[in-house]
């Protein structure tokens, strides 16, 4: 028979079936505590990393040396082959790597110049549209008689200003 154990959210100790206190926060997050001591410390916002009897403290201060020795770290080995990047074959990458710095700089500057020209072109187009729109607005304003705008009555009312 296998017992389903859970871990205390504060102390990190095992909680066996029929034990523990379940706390459900207003955001529907469930916390399971081993006993009222863990629950009380959690609600008082004590940090489990500062209490010597909790699992978090023991882990931070390297107290469980026996468990750490069991976990062997596997050394990351570099793979001997070289993979091609999506969109570029291995030959293209080798060719670019062999390229002289002067050629690379010239290509970069040409690309930057092209981008700047494109940005300048879009700015000029926006300016032209803006000028055209402003001239249309002035024509529309010129069509309205000034007397119609001035014939408004005096402003009346308390106005909802600040006190």
From Swiss-Prot:
Reply yes or no: does the keyword Cytoplasm apply. Answer: yes
Which InterPro entries does this chain map to? L24e/L24_sf, Ribosomal_eL24, Ribosomal_eL24-rel_N, Ribosomal_eL24_CS, TRASH_dom
- Compartments where located: Cytoplasm; Nucleus; Nucleus, Nucleolus; Nucleus, Nucleoplasm
Specify where it is mainly localized. cytoplasm
Residue span of region Disordered: 119-163
Which Pfam families does the record match to this protein? Answer: Ribosomal_L24e
Nucleus: is it a keyword of this entry?
Answer: yes
Domain of life assignment = Eukaryota
Q: Which GO terms describe its molecular function?
A: mRNA binding; structural constituent of ribosome
Q: What happens when the gene is disrupted?
A: Abnormal leaf patterning, with the abaxial mesophyll features appearing in the adaxial mesophyll domain.
| Comp. bias (Basic and acidic residues) | 119-133
Tissue occurrence: Ubiquitous.
> Per the record, what is one GO cellular component?
cytosol
Q: Which UniProt keywords apply?
A: Cytoplasm, Nucleus, Ribonucleoprotein, Ribosomal protein
| GO annotation terms (biological process) | adaxial/abaxial pattern specification; auxin-activated signaling pathway; gynoecium development; leaf morphogenesis
**Record function comment:** Might have an extraribosomal function in reinitiation of translation of ETTIN and MONOPTEROS genes that are involved in the auxin-mediated gynoecium patterning. Essential in leaf polarity establishment, probably having a role for translation in leaf dorsoventral patterning to specify leaf adaxial identity.
Family of the protein in this entry: Belongs to the eukaryotic ribosomal protein eL24 family.
- State whether it acts alone or in a complex, and with which partners, per the record: Interacts with REIL1 and REIL2. Component of the large ribosomal subunit.
Q: What is this protein called?
A: Large ribosomal subunit protein eL24y
Give the organism the record lists: Arabidopsis thaliana (Mouse-ear cress)
């Amino acid at each position: 028979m296998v017992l389903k154990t859970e871990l205390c959210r504060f102390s990190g100790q095992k909680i066996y079936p029929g034990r523990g206190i379940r706390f459900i926060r207003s955001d529907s997050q469930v916390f399971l505590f081993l006993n009222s001591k863990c629950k009380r410390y959690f609600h008082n916002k004590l940090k489990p990393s500062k209490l010597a009897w909790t699992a978090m403290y023991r882990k931070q201060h390297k107290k469980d040396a026996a468990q750490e020795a069991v976990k062997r770290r596997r050394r990351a080995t570099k793979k001997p082959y070289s993979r091609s990047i999506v969109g570029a074959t291995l030959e293209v990458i080798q060719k670019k790597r062999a390229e002289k710095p002067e050629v690379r700089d010239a290509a970069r500057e040409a690309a930057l110049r092209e981008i700047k020209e494109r940005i300048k072109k879009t700015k000029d187009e926006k300016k032209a549209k803006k000028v055209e729109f402003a001239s249309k607005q002035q024509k529309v304003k010129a069509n309205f008689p000034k007397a119609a705008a001035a014939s408004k009555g005096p402003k009346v009312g308390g106005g909802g200003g600040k006190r």
